[in-house]
Structure formats: C-alpha cells, structure tokens
Amino acid sequence: FTINNVGISGNMRLDDEVIRRELYTRPGELYNQSLLFQTIRTLGSMGHFTAEAIAPDIQPVVNSDELVDINWPLEEIASDQFQIAGGWGGGTFVGSVGVTLNNLSIKNFFKKGAWRPYPMGQNQRLSISAQTNGTYYKAFAISFTDPWMGGRKPNSFTISAHYSDENNAYYAWQKGTRYFRTAGVAAGLGKRLDWPDPYFTFYAEASYERYML
C-alpha cells in the first residue's frame, strides 16, 4: 500500500507542523508497519499526549486497492510544570520554586492574541528556577531549548545561565563580610542520529564559569 493522506486531530495547543515533522508515515511513501510503531513511540515521548491513547486510524481509499489514509487522533495532556519545595538543612530552612514551559513558541511572542497565557505551539522549553534560605544563600537558573533549531532538521539548541551567592551572614540581622559567588552561561547543540536508532543524540556544549570570592 501507498500512503495517500496523513491527518492529525485533537491537537489544540501544539502546532500541526511540530507534529508532522515527527511522523515517519508520510504521504507518497509505502506503508510500513515498523515506521508506524516508531511514530507511535515518538509521539508518546513528546510529553504532550496521552501515550496509551495514540492509535492511528488507517482507512483504505475509496475506489483504490493501493492507497490508504492514516489519521492520528491525539489526546492532549498538560505538559507545563510548576514546582515549589522546602526543606531543612545546615541548620536553616531552604525553599525553592521553579516553572517549566514545555510548549513555548518564540516566533509568536509579538503575535496579537498569542499570550493566552503565553505564546505556545512550537514545543520549545523554557525553565526558570530560584532557591534561597532567606539569609546567606540564593541561586537562580534559566534555560531555553529549541528541539528543532530553525524548524528544518531535528538539531536542538540549548542556552542556559545560572547565578549563586553565598555569604557568612548566617542571620538576617548580620551583614556579610565574605562571600562566594558563581555565575555561568552555556550553549549547546544536539544532533539526532540515525544509528543505532533515532533515539540516540550527539550533544556538544560550550560553557563559561566565573567564580568570585
């Protein structure tokens, strides 16, 4: 059989093009059962759909013995994360908060009506976190990842930055006289490999770290 049309339904937050670039079942190609299962695994690993509900609807084309249509009915799930935590360590309370947006769309930042609640659709990830004990320690981190840099090939781009500050003012009424600060940035590129299978990735990163005493 030859694949005639490939349809997608059920995606309200993720753009069609983002899903289609992950499909191994494409119009004009021969129907292949192994590529069908590979597509199911890939869609399930994206983290935006109910993996157990991914089941392609394969229908023969009317008046044809050689063509089939494949429709992918998808069930979206919440993929963003908000984390808040607290604990006791080193004789003090430590709190942390973080938010991760897993379906960001940078290209829609200035698009009218896109902020509902933020521009989404391109499967880009933005993560922001902060940690402090309220007195002598605080840390911040931010990272951004585009899994398909430029939208043409599955080459990922990641950029991140972090900052931490620790001093010897162990109580709120004290003034620190010594400190240890770190700041750093990093940028990395990832390339999806075909061998030994499409789930292997080569990743290279360059980073800069500064220590201040």
Question: Where are the model-predicted features located?
Answer:
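Solvent-exposed, non-transmembrane alpha-helical starts
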Residues: 2-7, 153
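Gram-negative/organellar outer-membrane beta-barrel architecture
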Residues: 13, 29-213
